[in-house]
């Protein structure tokens, strides 16, 4: 092998090394950009939490999923002409100040949407009950408008009391730090708060267990005794212990 061939071979190997280094550098730059974008997003989150006096962050969380997808799609296009794909695990899922919707939007639509979803739930419960009985659901056997409205109103009352108790519990935690506001609520706590009577909740695990069983029986009795009619005898679904009874009226 002459000197010219050796020089060409060395030049080719150097080009290969340089090309691999460029590819590695591009990947590293994309990763750094993704991490930097995530850092900026977390900084916005902390800034928003410090400025906001609200303890209830449900409004921000409401549209976080769609807002996160939108931000991710915006970052996929790069000026160099190739798609910059950012791994989902590198993206923050908590909403930032840019994804907070207008609160007035929920004031006019949340109640109607809730009632609509509750009505769908009542129909599904009725269909499931008929299916367990080996009967096909028909328009005559599904709840009539009055009966459906009654189910929705009862469900709304119970959920509103539960949500009020959850909010009361979070407020009584006392701390205003970000950790207590962002800390997720354990399901066991939520089950305990399900024992709701006029907005109160218990601190006794035994009472909570009894209340859950009592609530289940009350719901089953409500569905059974109602017979798809708009009226119901409340005494038939109440139990002897007044502390753990679940009311169906305000």
From Swiss-Prot:
Keywords: Nucleus, Transcription, Transcription regulation. One of its GO terms (biological process) is signaling. Its main location: nucleus. It is found in: Nucleus, Nucleolus. GO terms for molecular function: RNA polymerase I general transcription initiation factor activity. GO terms for cellular component: cytosol; nucleolus; RNA polymerase I upstream activating factor complex. It comes from the Eukaryota. Residues 1-30 are annotated as: Disordered. The keyword Acetylation does not apply. The keyword Transcription regulation applies. Component of the UAF (upstream activation factor) complex. Interacts with rrn5, rrn7, rrn11 and ssp27. Component of the UAF (upstream activation factor) complex which interacts with the upstream element of the RNA polymerase I promoter and is required for the proper accumulation of rpa1/nuc1 at rDNAs. Required for nucleolar localization of condensin. Belongs to the RRN9 family. This is RNA polymerase I-specific transcription initiation factor RRN9 homolog. It comes from Schizosaccharomyces pombe (strain 972 / ATCC 24843).
């Amino acid at each position: 092998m002459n000197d010219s061939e050796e020089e060409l071979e060395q030049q080719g190997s150097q080009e290969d090394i340089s090309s691999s280094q460029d590819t590695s550098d591009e990947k590293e730059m994309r990763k750094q950009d993704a991490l930097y974008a995530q850092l900026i997003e977390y900084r916005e989150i902390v800034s928003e939490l410090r400025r906001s006096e609200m303890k209830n962050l449900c409004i921000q969380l409401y549209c976080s999923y769609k807002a996160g997808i939108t931000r991710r799609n915006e970052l996929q296009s790069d000026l160099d002409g190739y798609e910059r794909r950012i791994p989902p695990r590198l993206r923050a899922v908590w909403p930032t100040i840019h994804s907070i919707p207008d609160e007035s939007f929920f004031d006019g639509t949340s109640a109607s949407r809730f009632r609509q979803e509750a009505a769908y739930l009542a129909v599904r419960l009725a269909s499931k009950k008929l299916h367990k009985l080996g009967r096909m659901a028909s328009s005559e056997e599904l709840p009539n408008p009055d009966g459906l409205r009654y189910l929705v109103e009862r469900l709304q009352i119970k959920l509103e009391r539960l949500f009020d108790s959850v909010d009361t519990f979070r407020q009584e935690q006392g701390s205003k730090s970000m950790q207590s506001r962002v800390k997720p609520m354990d399901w066991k706590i939520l089950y305990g708060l399900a024992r709701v009577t006029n907005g109160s909740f218990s601190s006794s695990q035994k009472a909570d267990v009894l209340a859950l069983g009592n609530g289940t029986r009350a719901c089953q009795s409500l569905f059974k005794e109602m017979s798809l009619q708009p009226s119901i005898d409340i005494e038939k679904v109440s139990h002897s212990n007044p502390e753990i009874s679940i009311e169906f009226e305000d």
